[in-house]
Regions:
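Extracellular jelly-roll beta-sandwich "head" domains, especially the C-terminal globular C1q domain
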Residues: 1-148
Length: 148
């Protein structure tokens, strides 16, 4: 069973066709969060059809001072690039002590049927004190897969 398989075609579906994948643009690596302020991480523009949106935000504790605490974190998918959306979200109230270089990741998934062309945004929000938090852009993304 361990043999190579040659596909008849090496081309991927054209953007917007069934099976097409769109990988969203991502903000600059190391961008700092402001506590309590939403940050736009990535966005994709999708066309009519049924899509799975897969979002991931990875962030790192970039610096700490006395008693650093991550109070809560959340990510969301929606059409706004300035506010957290109710379309789909993943939230945690943690109130945990953090250390320098701690890495935290959150994921969100949504299946959408759309009848027009829309841009969806992956937003992140962190509430923290006595530390700074930065985006790990190479590991953060928003991807859309057309399934129908």
């Amino acid at each position: 069973m361990n043999s190579n398989i040659t596909l008849a075609s090496t081309s991927l579906p054209t953007s917007g066709q069934l099976g097409s994948v769109i990988v969203g643009s991502v903000i600059t690596n190391g961008t700092l969060f402001t506590s309590g302020t939403p940050l736009s991480i990535s966005n994709v523009t999708i066309t009519p059809g049924v899509w799975i949106l897969l979002g991931q935000v990875v962030f790192t504790i970039a610096s700490v001072s006395t008693s650093p605490v991550l109070i809560g974190h959340a990510i969301s998918l929606g059409q706004s690039n300035t506010a957290m959306a109710l379309l789909c979200s993943n939230e945690d109230i943690v109130s945990e002590t953090v250390a320098l270089s701690n890495v935290i990741s959150k994921q969100v998934t949504r299946i959408l049927a759309v009848n027009g062309t829309y841009t969806y945004n992956l937003m992140a929000l962190n509430t923290f004190s006595n530390c700074t938090i930065s985006v790990n852009a190479p590991a953060s993304n928003l991807t859309a897969l057309r399934i129908a």
